Amino acid sequence: MNKSPIQAVIFDWAGTIVDFGSFAPTSIFVEAFKQGFDFEIDLEEAREPMGLGKWDHIQAVGRIPAVDKRWNEKFGRSMISEDIDAIYAAFMPLQKAKVADHAEPILNAIEVVNGLKDKGIKIGSCSGYPREVMDVLIPVAADYGYQPDYVVATDDLPQGGRPAPFMALKNVIELGVSDVKACVKVDDSAPGIFEGHNAGMWTVGLLLSGNEAGLTFEEYQAADEATLEKAREKARAKLLKSSPHYLIDTIADFPEVVADIERRLAAGERP
C-alpha cells in the first residue's frame, strides 16, 4: 500500500472515538453541581462548553446567563473560584467511577483507526478529561481494541488545554511528526476544532456521534432521516463557528475525508 502523505490523525475521545453522544461527562456535570451545592443544571447547560478542560468547563457553565441568574438567586453572588474548586472536587470521583461505563468504541471506530494504522498513519489523541480520569479510561478502551499511539490529558501540560494548540502539538512532538500540515484533528466540539486550527492542522467535526447532537446510540439507530437531519443542523450550527475543513456524521465517514486530504496534500494544498 502506498504510504499516505498524512503523518498523524489526532482524535478526541468522548463523542469522537468512544461514548456515543458524549454522555459520560455531561451527566456527571449535572450530578457534581447537585452534590457540591444542591444546585440544578440541565443536560443542555452541561453540554454548552464541552471540549474545554473540566475546571474551565465548570466555570463556563457558571457564566451561562441563565445559570448565573439562578446562582445569584440562590447564593446572592456569581460563582467564584472556590465554588468551581468544590464542584470539580465532586466531579472527579464521580467521573472516575463512571467513565469506564462509557468506554465502548463508537460504531466502526476500531476499523477506521486500524485502517489508518495500515497506511502508516500515527494515531494521536487528546481529551478534555484530566489525567486521573484518562488513567481509568485508557485501559478499558484498550480492552475494546482502541490503543492510540499517544494520549494527552487536559491537565498534562502547564500551558493548558483547548482551544489553544498545546495538546495537539504535544502529540506532534511525541509522535515524531515533521510537518503539522500532514496532521488531521478530529473532534465533536468547537474548542477541539479550534485547537486543530491553532496547531496548523486539517480539522474534521463530527455532527451526530458527539456532544452537539446529544443522541444516544439507540436514538441514533432508531431515528428516521428527518430526526437525524434536525440533529445534524443543531450540531452544524454550533460547529460551523469553529470553521472545520470537513463536517461528517460519525467516524465511520472519515475514510472519505482522509482520501480527500491525501489528494489535496499531493496537490500542494495546506490547511
From Swiss-Prot:
One Gene Ontology term, aspect cellular component: cytosol
Superkingdom of source: Bacteria
Chain residues that bind Mg(2+): D12, A14, D188
EC number assigned by the record: 3.11.1.1
Cofactor dependence: Mg(2+)
GO molecular function: magnesium ion binding; phosphoglycolate phosphatase activity; phosphonoacetaldehyde hydrolase activity
Coiled coil: none
Record field: catalytic activity: phosphonoacetaldehyde + H2O = acetaldehyde + phosphate + H(+)
UniProt keywords, alphabetically: Hydrolase, Magnesium, Metal-binding, Schiff base
Residues of the active site: D12 (nucleophile), K54 (schiff-base intermediate with substrate)
Matching InterPro entries: HAD-like_hydrolase_sf, HAD-like_sf, HAD-SF_hydro_IA, HAD_sf, PGP-like_dom2, Phosphonoacetald_hydro
Gene3D superfamilies: HAD superfamily/HAD-like, Putative phosphatase, domain 2
Cofactor-binding details, from the entry: Binds 1 Mg(2+) ion per subunit.
Annotated GO biological process: DNA repair; organic phosphonate catabolic process
Similarity comment: Belongs to the HAD-like hydrolase superfamily. PhnX family.
Oligomer and partners: Homodimer.
NCBIfam families with a match to the protein in the record: HAD-SF-IA-v3, phosphonatase
HAMAP family, per the entry: PhnX (MF_01375)
Function: Involved in phosphonate degradation.
Name the UniProt record assigns to this protein: Phosphonoacetaldehyde hydrolase
Species whose genome carries this gene: Vibrio vulnificus (strain YJ016)
Encoding gene per record: phnX
